Amino acid sequence: SQCKAMTVKFTVELDIERLTGQTYTDFIKNLRRSLATWYLHGVPVLPLYNQEADPRGFDLKLTFRGQVTTVRIHRDDLVLRGYQMQGAGKWLELERPSTQTGHLIEGSELLEFGPSYEELAAAAQQDILDISYNKNALQDAVSKLAVSTNTRDRARSLIVVSQMFCEATRFVDIANHFAFNLESSEPVKLPQWMQNDLEKNWVRFSFMILKSNADPCYKFEPQTIYGKIIKTADELLNFLGIVEQHPDTRSPPCAAG
């Protein structure tokens, strides 16, 4: 079925040239607040993920020394879906033409790769863990997205933006890691445990946290993060910067007692 075009709910802007670890941290925290529909023990929860209604997005406008690129991110799941080159007007969408799902961004040109990290890494010809994530990398990403038509450069730059904004918004440890190392002159890599233990589990962790909160009969399965056993949903919640709200978590709880 043809999907509907995404409506943009708000736009946030960030100048990469003057970015510091502190202003980056503040930006991520403000972004979480802008996205929140409610809070669970102080942690923002995203709007209900809805596949029937018109998809909602937000734009992130990034500038560096006069160069501009705007990326469009799906609000319900924080997946980067497209971007706009400098002065081009036309949007480029992360979707292979062969998927036949239609355009999430109206009038967009479909790229040769989809939004998953597997497809992005294949197009970039580089592993997620081999890419650098710091201020230099972000400046380079903005410059490349503003003007480059090279698939490898585009894909690598989109990975940098997705990690440093989408993943950092999802996870406290990832935001802290990027903030602490932002101004490093050496390449800054993503630790493997953050990819394996956190990033690959955000949807599942979100579900477990909200289900535990809504359903007294839900049995929480202990999780392992960085070698530590996490025994409760409240403990797991501490790792999340924002929680995805899946419709399944709102099913009526069992009859307790």
UniProtKB/Swiss-Prot annotation:
It is an enzyme of class 3 (hydrolase). Gene3D superfamilies: Ricin (A subunit), domain 1, Ricin (A Subunit), domain 2. The keyword Hydrolase applies. SUPFAM superfamilies: Ribosome inactivating proteins (RIP) (SSF56371). GO terms for biological process: defense response; negative regulation of translation. Keywords: Disulfide bond, Hydrolase, Plant defense, Protein synthesis inhibitor, Toxin. The record marks 79, 117, 170 as: Important for catalytic activity. It comes from the Eukaryota. Its EC number is 3.2.2.22. InterPro entries: Ribosome-inact_prot_sf, Ribosome_inactivat_1/2, Ribosome_inactivat_prot, Ribosome_inactivat_prot_sub1, Ribosome_inactivat_prot_sub2. Belongs to the ribosome-inactivating protein family. Type 1 RIP subfamily. Inhibits translation in rabbit reticulocytes. This is Ribosome-inactivating protein charybdin. It comes from Drimia maritima (Sea squill).
